[in-house]
């Protein structure tokens, strides 16, 4: 049995990237919350 996490940058960006987040209202809310919290990194 192999490990479940096989990192790939492209898949990571496509699922959790900035542009994907900006597409939906809930995604924009995530970014807004992270900005308010003062996160240095907003998305993957």
Swiss-Prot record:
Which Gene3D superfamilies does the protein's record reference? 1.10.287.3980
Cross-referenced InterPro entries: Ribosomal_bL34, Ribosomal_bL34_CS
Alphabetized Pfam families for the sequence: Ribosomal_L34
Q: What is this protein called?
A: Large ribosomal subunit protein bL34
GO-annotated molecular function: structural constituent of ribosome
Q: Which GO terms describe its biological process?
A: translation
Which residue ranges are recorded for the region named Disordered? 1-44
The record's GO CC annotations read: ribonucleoprotein complex; ribosome
Where composition is biased (Basic residues), the residues are: 9-23, 30-44
Identify the keywords attached in UniProt to this record, alphabetized: Ribonucleoprotein, Ribosomal protein
Tell me its family: Belongs to the bacterial ribosomal protein bL34 family.
């Amino acid at each position: 049995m192999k490990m479940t996490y096989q990192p790939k940058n492209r898949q990571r960006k496509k699922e959790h990237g900035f542009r994907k987040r900006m597409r939906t209202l809930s995604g924009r809310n995530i970014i807004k919350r992270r900005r308010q919290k003062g996160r240095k990194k907003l998305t993957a």
